[in-house]
Amino acid sequence: ECLVTEGLKVKLQWASAFGHAHQRVAFGLELWKGILREHPEIKAPFSRVRGDNIYSPQFGAHSQRVLSGLDITISMLDTPDMLAAQLAHLKVQHVERNLKPEFFDIFLKHLLHVLGDRLGTHFDFGAWHDCVDQIIDGIKDI
């Protein structure tokens, strides 16, 4: 469960880690490099957006769509009704793409790794795990 105080901390830490403009592109590259290096099988579901080349404009745009979706959901952590509606919308999109539930767990693992690298000693792993678990559980088709 993502407590109110955890949600507020996650929002603040996300703003710091995700940054602005080019920092967001770099965040996406770091995240997807780790995911695809350890799990090359994940490239296949992303063939439509050039999952074979994370430096392509198509994959860069996809990366920013994913991270913007995460950004929106994080911004709604303190508005449960809005968050529930957003998660329902995202779930439909992800179910249509037939993404395996374990892909979400892989995403979470790598997201937490990148956040830890960027936030250092300020990173609250527990708060992030609780809040992003809530987001992911609302999206993935279990």
From Swiss-Prot:
CDD domains (alphabetical): Mb-like
GO terms for MF: heme binding; iron ion binding; oxygen binding; oxygen carrier activity
The answer, when asked if Transcription is one of the entry's keywords, is: no
Binding positions for heme b?
Answer: H94
UniProtKB keywords? Disulfide bond, Heme, Iron, Metal-binding, Oxygen transport, Transport
Q: Which domain of life is it from?
A: Eukaryota
Q: Which cysteines are joined by disulfide bonds?
A: C2-C131
Residues in Globin domain copies: 1-142
Its cellular-component GO annotations read: extracellular region; hemoglobin complex
Kindly list any coiled-coil regions of this protein: none
Pfam families noted in UniProt:
Globin (PF00042)
User: Does Coiled coil appear among the keywords?
Assistant: no
- Describe, as the record does, how this protein assembles with itself and its partners: The extracellular hemoglobin of the earthworm consists of 12 subunits that have a hexagonal bilayer structure with a molecular weight near 3.8 million. Each one-twelfth subunit is composed primarily of disulfide linked trimers (chains A, B, and C) and monomers (chain D).
> What does the sequence similarity comment in the record state about its family?
Belongs to the globin family.
The name under which this protein is listed is Extracellular globin-1
